[in-house]
Amino acid sequence: MADTSIILPPGLPQVIIEREFAAPAQLVLRAHLEPGLLARWLGPREMTMTVERYEARHGGTWRYIHRGPDGQEHAFRGVFHGQPSAAGIVQTFEYEGTPGHVKLDTTTLQERDGVTLLRTVSSFQSVDDRDAMVASGMERGVRDSGERLEALLATLTPVH
């Protein structure tokens, strides 16, 4: 439907990601909260994903591993803060390869006429941390994820 917008506010330790999906917020939320669906779209398209733990509730923890075609593994973990809903999914995010460099992601979903705007604000501990994440190839992973999520959403049926 639309391209992904990635904004790096100058001098601020944030990344703002926005993308519209031709799907109701309920489906976009479901794709974010069900581990089996999450594994089908999150991350660069050439990587496979294994969800080890995904407790989408206040205080719940999560951990997943991306594996590249070369077998190299990249593990990530975090904690949910508050009850995840379309009004907000708040969670920490840490790449285990760089422990201690934790960011806070706040994702909101706004639906209008069957189109959902997904907006994620990632707050880093410093501009240097943000810039290191961007330099690691984050943009390609974010764009691949958006395209893969759009394709997945087209296959899902809303639950009434």
Q: Language-model features: where?
A:
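Intrinsic-disorder/low-complexity, polar/charged segments enriched in Ser/Thr/Lys/Arg/Asp/Glu/Gln
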Residues: 12-18, 49, 61, 75, ...
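Short beta-edge strand/loop motif at the mouth of beta-sheet-based domains
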Residues: 16-17, 36-73, 160
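A short, structured loop/turn motif at beta-sheet edges
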Residues: 25-26, 56-57, 81-87, 108-117
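Hydrophobic pocket/interface hotspot
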Residues: 28, 38, 62, 80, ...
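Short, solvent-exposed aromatic-acidic interface loops
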Residues: 69, 94-100, 121-128
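A conserved amphipathic terminal alpha-helix motif
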Residues: 125-160
